[in-house]
């Protein structure tokens, strides 16, 4: 199990080291527009899971939404501190 901060650190490392075959690297290379579309897709899946699926399914969908949100932040050069200042 990872914390939100640990996931961000792992994704940031992948963005820097660019391991071959990394899905995160491929997503970053696809650009902000594609990442934004993916984030919207995941948000819709969270909504549907909240209304029609189990708690476990909802938790999984939220985890995917958080992953894509973090990848988008990294693509834009933002950090979690940038977000935390707005909470």
Curated annotation (Swiss-Prot):
The keyword Plastid does not apply. It is an enzyme of class 3 (hydrolase). Its main location: cytoplasm. InterPro entries: HisE (IPR008179), PRib-ATP_PPHydrolase-like (IPR021130). Pathway: Amino-acid biosynthesis; L-histidine biosynthesis; L-histidine from 5-phospho-alpha-D-ribose 1-diphosphate: step 2/9. Its EC number is 3.6.1.31. Keywords: Amino-acid biosynthesis, ATP-binding, Cytoplasm, Histidine biosynthesis, Hydrolase, Nucleotide-binding. One of its GO terms (biological process) is L-histidine biosynthetic process. Pfam families: PRA-PH. It comes from the Bacteria. HAMAP family: HisE. Belongs to the PRA-PH family. This is Phosphoribosyl-ATP pyrophosphatase. It comes from Mycobacteroides abscessus (strain ATCC 19977 / DSM 44196 / CCUG 20993 / CIP 104536 / JCM 13569 / NCTC 13031 / TMC 1543 / L948).
């Amino acid at each position: 199990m990872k914390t939100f901060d640990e996931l961000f650190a792992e994704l940031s490392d992948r963005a820097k080291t660019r391991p071959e075959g990394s899905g995160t690297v491929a997503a970053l290379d696809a650009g902000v527009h594609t990442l934004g579309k993916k984030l919207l897709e995941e948000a819709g899946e969270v909504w549907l899971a909240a209304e029609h699926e189990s708690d476990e399914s909802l938790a999984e969908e939220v985890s995917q939404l958080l992953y894509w949100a973090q990848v988008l932040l990294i693509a834009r050069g933002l950090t979690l501190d940038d977000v935390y200042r707005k909470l």
